[in-house]
Regions:
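Alpha-amylase-like alpha-glycosidases and glucanotransferases acting on alpha-linked glucans and related
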Residues: 3, 9-12, 46-182, 207-439, ...
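Short glycine/serine/threonine/alanine-rich loop segments
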Residues: 32, 197, 325
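Outer-envelope exported proteins of Gram-negative bacteria
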Residues: 38, 198-200, 204, 279, ...
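Conserved, well-ordered alpha-helix/loop/beta-strand core segments that scaffold catalytic motifs
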Residues: 174-207
Length: 500
C-alpha cells in the first residue's frame, strides 16, 4: 500500500511518472500482485482525500509536469519550474497545487484541434464532467468561496446551469485538466496490469458539503433546499482511534430520495470507480447498513444516533449493473448484526487489521487464527500507526502478547529498519493467515517508526504528508518479500488468463 502522493518525485508530491513505474517493477519482482492506493479525488484544505469537492474528478497535483512537455504543450523551462527543492520526505501540497495549476493553465493555451477532439470524446463518455467543470469555473469566479456563499444566480444549480454557455471557455480548462489526469493514470494502470499487478482503489462513502455532488444534487441529501440548513452530519462514535469519536461533518444522504431513482448516482459512482481501479475498497461500508448521524451543531461525535442505511436495496441495483463487482468492504469500527448480515448478503470480503487483534484479554476477529478466507488482512492501514510505532506505543501487556503470539523471542523488539526482526515476525504472521489477500504499507516493509505514519484519525493537522524516496524503495529487502510471498503461497496472479 502506497498512495501516489507518497511516491518519490521531483515535484513536491508524487506524480504519474517513471518513479511509479519503478515502484511497480519492484513490487512485481517481489511477487506482489496487488497495489493499494488512497482515493484519487481532489483534496480539501486539510489535504484529506476523504473529503473532496468531487466524487468523480481526479486530483490534478498528480499530473506529471514532464508529461505535458512530452505532449508538446509546454517547453522544458516550463515543466522544470515545477521542480521542488524542499525535503523529499514530506508532501508539500501547497507548492504542488499552486505550481501544477499554473503549469496546466499555460499548457491549456497550446492545445491543438486533435487534442480538442480527444477531450470532447472524453467528455461524452464521462457525464459527470460537465457539472464538475462548471462548478470549478464558477468557484474560481466566486474567489473559491463555498458554493452556498455564491451569488444567487450561481448558488442554485438549476439557475446556474441554464447559463452554461457563458462558462464554456473557463469550464473547458477543467475538462482539459481531467482529460490529462485520466490519460496519465490509465497509462500507469495499464503498465501495472501488464506486470500482473492489480490496483485496489479507495472510494470514500461521503462527499464534502462544498462539492459539485451536493451543489448539483441537493435533493439527494438531508439538506433544506431553501435555507440550505443541515440538521445532521456524518461521523462515527468513540472507538479505537478516538475517545471523542470522529466528527467528519459531511452531509448525509437522503436514502429514500435516492431509492426513488434506483440509486442512479451510486450506480454511476461505483461504475466509475470500477473503471478507475481493478478492485474498489468502499470506505466506511458499515454506513450502508446503519450510520451515525450527529447534530450539526455538535463539537464532537459523542452524541448521535444510528439510522438505517439502504442495505441490500442499493446493492441489488449494483449487482444488476455490475455482476460480481470486485468490491472490498471496509468494515472496521463499531458494528452490529446488521453489518454482519450485509457483508454476508453482498458476499464482499471484509478487512482484518492485525494491530486490532493483539488484545490479550479477548479472542478478536482480527487475530490471524480467526481470519476467514473471504477477507483482506492488513499489517496496518493508512489510519494505523506503523507496526514498529505500534510496538513502541502499545502497553507492556499488549506488546508482550503480540510478540509471543508471533513467535518473537529476542529482546531487541524495538529495532527498526529494513531487517527489523520484530516487524518481520508480525508480517509473517499476517502472511500465514487464511485471508485471501494480505496487504502491507511500504512504511512497514521498511521498519519505519511512528513518524512515518500517514494519518491519525480525528487529528486535523499534519496528516497525509508521508513521502518516500527511490533510494528507500531500492533498499527494501526484495529477496525477503519474494521469499515469504512464495513460502506462504501469495504469488498467485491477480488476473486470470481470460483477463490477461
Amino acid at each position: 500500500m502506497l498512495h501516489i502522493s507518497s511516491m518519490p518525485s521531483d515535484y513536491g508530491v508524487g506524480v504519474f511518472d517513471e518513479n511509479v513505474i519503478h515502484f511497480i517493477d519492484k513490487i512485481a519482482d517481489m511477487g506482489f500482485t496487488y497495489w493499494q492506493v488512497l482515493p484519487f479525488n481532489p483534496i480539501d484544505r486539510a489535504n484529506s482525500p476523504y473529503c473532496s469537492p468531487s466524487a468523480f474528478a481526479g486530483n490534478y497535483i498528480f499530473i506529471n509536469p514532464k508529461g505535458l512537455y512530452d505532449m508538446g504543450l509546454i517547453c522544458e523551462e516550463d515543466y522544470k519550474s515545477n521542480i521542488y527543492d524542499g525535503t523529499p520526505y514530506t508532501a508539500d501540497y501547497e507548492f504542488a497545487g499552486k505550481k501544477r495549476l499554473e503549469l496546466l493553465k499555460k499548457a491549456f493555451l497550446n492545445i491543438n484541434d486533435e487534442l480538442a477532439r480527444q477531450i470532447k470524446e472524453f467528455e461524452i463518455s464521462n457525464s459527470w464532467l460537465t457539472d464538475y467543470s462548471v462548478f470549478m469555473a464558477v468557484k474560481e469566479e466566486e474567489n473559491m468561496k463555498p458554493w452556498w456563499e455564491w451569488s444567487d444566480e450561481h448558488a442554485h444549480y438549476f439557475e446556474c446551469i441554464k447559463d452554461i454557455y457563458s462558462y464554456e471557455k473557463s469550464a473547458a480548462f477543467w475538462k482539459f485538466v481531467q482529460f490529462v489526469f485520466y490519460k496519465q493514470w490509465n497509462e500507469i494502470k495499464a503498465y501495472a496490469n501488464k506486470k500482473g499487478v492489480a490496483v485496489i482503489g479507495d472510494m470514500p462513502i461521503y462527499v464534502a458539503m462544498d462539492s459539485v455532488d451536493v451543489w448539483s444534487n441537493l435533493p439527494m441529501f438531508l439538506i433544506d433546499e431553501k435555507t440550505l440548513k443541515v440538521e445532521k452530519v456524518a461521523g462515527v462514535p468513540p472507538d479505537y482511534f478516538s475517545k471523542d469519536g470522529q466528527l467528519w461533518g459531511n452531509p448525509i444522504y437522503d436514502w429514500n430520495a435516492m431509492e426513488k431513482d434506483d440509486f442512479s448516482w451510486w450506480i454511476s459512482r461505483i461504475g466509475h470507480s470500477l473503471k478507475l481501479y481493478d478492485t474498489v475498497r468502499i470506505d466506511h461500508f458499515r454506513a450502508f447498513a446503519s450510520y451515525w448521524a450527529v447534530p450539526a451543531e455538535s463539537k464532537t461525535a459523542k452524541v448521535g444516533e444510528w439510522l438505517d442505511g439502504p442495505k441490500m436495496k442499493l446493492f441489488n441495483k449494483v449487482f444488476e449493473a455490475y455482476p460480481n463487482a470486485p468490491i472490498i468492504a471496509e468494515d472496521l469500527g463499531v458494528f452490529g448484526d446488521d453489518v454482519v448480515k450485509l457483508l454476508e448478503d453482498t458476499g464482499f470480503p471484509g478487512m482484518k487489521v492485525v494491530q486490532f487483534g493483539f488484545d490479550p484479554n479477548s479472542d478478536s476477529s482480527h487475530i490471524p487464527h480467526n481470519s476467514v478466507q473471504n477477507s483482506i488482512n492488513y499489517v496496518g492501514t493508512h489510519d494505523n500507526n506503523t507496526i514498529l510505532g505500534w510496538l513502541w506505543e502499545a502497553s507492556d501487556e499488549e506488546r508482550k502478547f503480540a510478540l509471543e503470539y508471533c513467535g518473537f523471542t529476542g529482546d531487541n523488539w524495538g529495532e527498526g529498519g529494513y531487517y527489523s526482526p520484530s516487524c518481520r515476525k508480525i508480517i509473517e504472521t499476517v502472511w500465514k493467515s487464511s485471508s485471501n489477500v494480505a496487504i502491507i504499507a511500504l512504511q512497514d516493509m521498511c521498519g519505519f517508526g511512528s513518524d512515518a505514519r500517514m494519518n491519525i484519525p480525528g487529528v486535523p493537522e499534519k496528516n497525509w504528508r508521508f513521502r518516500t524516496t527511490k533510494e528507500t524503495i531500492d533498499n527494501i529487502d526484495s529477496s525477503y518479500f519474494k521469499h515469504i510471498n512464495s513460502l506462504f503461497r501469495r504469488m498467485y496472479p491477480a488476473f486470470d488468463d481470460k483477463k490477461n
